[in-house]
């Protein structure tokens, strides 16, 4: 397979015009079981909308403490579950922490219920039982039968708009619920504020502000129905507030066109004929309700669901056809599903007019590039962005420009560490943007100013208050008393510094090159020659006692242990091999890993 893959990569330009339906090999359901943390719903390559079902809504806290079960729902969907609460428009894929789950929509019929019910008793609320036998997940398309209300739910998407199609039974009590309370990694105070405006009997707009992994996040929306609703209403679950003003003069619970609060659910009522399809277009914007509506009108001007679905599949086929593999069918499923997952993030983060909200919370315009967000760089700098330099060079160029825009807007003057939705959540370790920038510049992908990029790398790497960098600069390592991840931080900073050195060398900055090459050797300060492993070191330069190479707790490593992190010296493998006793001992050690 490797031989065929390399051959195909070399001949991508020659196969581009003979597109195959490679999307047929994509199985988005892969990764949704146990701890895969992927979602099965509809999205397009690098899309801002990820329209997917939530199989439960688990609170981040329980009895005032962290609820471990919430981790199972990083992507909102768990294959083992048997109920669906609704379909929301934003999701993270493959992460070990989470956020999002904005604007949950659920069709129902019969008696109106405004609470979601429970997994053990779905009929006590608006959620529904479902079966995987009646579920289809494809690239750009999702379908499921909602058993309790006999409704067929279908989803597709464009870059900034999700499209729903609900096939109802005959009923004079059909409803579509919009839950503005629901969210992934949710907790009672996560919603800072929500606002909804009913523009007419088929269009509503609004926004939601949340304080989660991204601490200041606002998402605007426009929601359009293919059929006029006959009535609507809302329920406000806010705790009693000290001041509510004089809005009590109105009955805001039914047919009132302007609603605001922290904990809101809305409903829209319809009469439906047997097998009648009611469609919903749901557009997002980081900037304004007006922009969300503009995104909707630009990307899905009509109501042809099948056309949008076919367009989404065509977009996936365009990307998947960049690599051809000659292997058996099962391997093709694994390969193209993995390729599909690789092309979900980073996500588009600007409107069709180029506007986006920057890290400074001001509105900016992406001039000459697409602005991207969702940079999980600790996870992606090693392989994903180098991969993009080969088969997504234009996009990776835009991604680097997005990182530079992030730096320019940063109050701390730092490149992104883990950014999404105009926030940096500072998750994981290292300053791995510098690796992505350096690789793109040296390979000729980045079309921006390399001198400015180098300065951004230097400034980021010298932010002394961030995660032990001051100690790292002064002592050549981070004392274990100062950080619970002191060793992994030191190792990752050392690699990043080597990247900065290579960029400085390309730009003929000799003094910078020498400084950062010296810093790139700091890994040696955590290498214990007596045992051949990386080991936490105290401020007095003695190695930490009670050392366990297998343990992942209190040993100075993040999501790892000394056994796997001791091999992380990609900038100087020859010296690492020497320190571990030569090639034979090194190979033997690898074999026992």
Please describe what each predicted stretch is:
Residues 496:
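ATP-dependent phospho-/nucleotidyl transfer catalytic cores
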Residues 1-20:
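Bacterial Sec-dependent N-terminal signal peptides
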Residues 19-385, 389-435, 441-491, 499-525, ...:
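Accessory carbohydrate-recognition regions in carbohydrate-active enzymes
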């Amino acid at each position: 397979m490797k031989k065929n893959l390399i051959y195909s990569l070399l001949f991508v330009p020659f196969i581009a015009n003979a597109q195959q339906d490679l999307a047929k090999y994509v199985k988005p359901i892969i990764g949704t079981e146990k701890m895969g943390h992927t979602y099965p719903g509809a999205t397009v390559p690098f899309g801002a909308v990820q329209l997917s079902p939530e199989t439960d809504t688990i609170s981040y806290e329980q009895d005032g403490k962290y609820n471990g079960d919430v981790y199972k729902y990083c992507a909102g969907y768990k294959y083992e579950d048997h109920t669906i609460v609704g379909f929301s428009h934003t999701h993270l894929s493959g992460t070990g922490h989470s956020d999002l789950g904005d604007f949950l929509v659920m069709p129902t019929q019969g008696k109106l219920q405004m609470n979601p019910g429970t997994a053990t008793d779905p009929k006590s609320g608006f959620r529904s039982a479902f079966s995987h036998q009646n579920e289809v997940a494809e690239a750009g398309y999702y379908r499921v039968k909602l058993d309790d209300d006999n409704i067929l739910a279908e989803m597709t998407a464009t870059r900034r708009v999700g499209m729903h199609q609900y096939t109802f039974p005959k009923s004079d009590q059909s409803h579509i619920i919009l839950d503005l309370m629901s969210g992934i990694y949710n907790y009672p105070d996560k919603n800072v504020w929500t606002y909804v405006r009913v523009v007419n009997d088929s269009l509503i707009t609004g926004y939601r502000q949340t304080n989660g992994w991204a601490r200041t996040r606002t998402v605007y929306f426009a929601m359009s129905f293919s059929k006029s609703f006959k009535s609507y209403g809302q329920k406000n679950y806010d705790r009693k507030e000290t001041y509510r003003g004089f809005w009590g003069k109105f009955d805001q619970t039914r047919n009132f066109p302007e609603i605001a609060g922290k904990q809101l659910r809305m409903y829209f009522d319809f009469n439906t004929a047997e097998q009648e399809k009611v469609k919903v277009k749901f557009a997002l914007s980081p900037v304004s309700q007006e922009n969300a509506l503009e995104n909707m009108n630009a990307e899905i001007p009509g109501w042809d669901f099948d056309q949008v679905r076919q367009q989404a599949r065509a977009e996936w086929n365009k990307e998947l056809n960049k690599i051809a593999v000659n292997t058996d069918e099962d391997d093709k499923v694994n390969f193209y599903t993995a390729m599909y997952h690789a092309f979900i993030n980073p996500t588009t983060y600007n409107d069709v007019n180029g506007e986006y909200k920057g890290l400074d919370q001001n509105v900016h315009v992406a001039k000459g590039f697409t602005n991207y967000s969702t940079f999980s760089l600790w996870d992606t700098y090693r392989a994903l962005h180098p991969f993009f330099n080969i088969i997504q060079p234009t996009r990776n160029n835009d991604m680097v420009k997005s990182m530079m825009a992030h730096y320019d807007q940063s109050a701390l003057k730092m490149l992104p560490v883990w950014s999404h939705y105009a926030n940096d959540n500072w998750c994981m370790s290292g300053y791995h943007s510098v690796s992505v920038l350096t690789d793109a510049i040296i390979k000729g992908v980045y079309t921006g100013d390399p001198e400015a990029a180098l300065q951004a790398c230097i400034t980021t790497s010298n932010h002394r208050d961030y995660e032990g960098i001051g100690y790292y600069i002064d002592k050549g390592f981070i004392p274990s008393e100062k950080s619970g991840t002191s060793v992994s931080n030191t190792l990752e900073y050392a690699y990043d510094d080597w990247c900065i050195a290579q960029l400085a060398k390309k730009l003929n900055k000799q003094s910078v090159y020498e400084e950062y090459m010296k810093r790139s050797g700091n890994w040696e300060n955590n290498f214990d020659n007596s045992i051949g492993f990386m080991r936490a070191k105290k401020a007095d330069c003695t190695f930490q006692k009670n050392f366990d190479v297998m343990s992942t707790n209190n040993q100075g490593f993040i999501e790892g242990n000394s056994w796997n992190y001791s091999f992380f010296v990609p900038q100087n493998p020859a010296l690492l091999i020497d320190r571990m006793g030569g090639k034979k001992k090194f190979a033997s050690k690898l074999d026992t890993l």
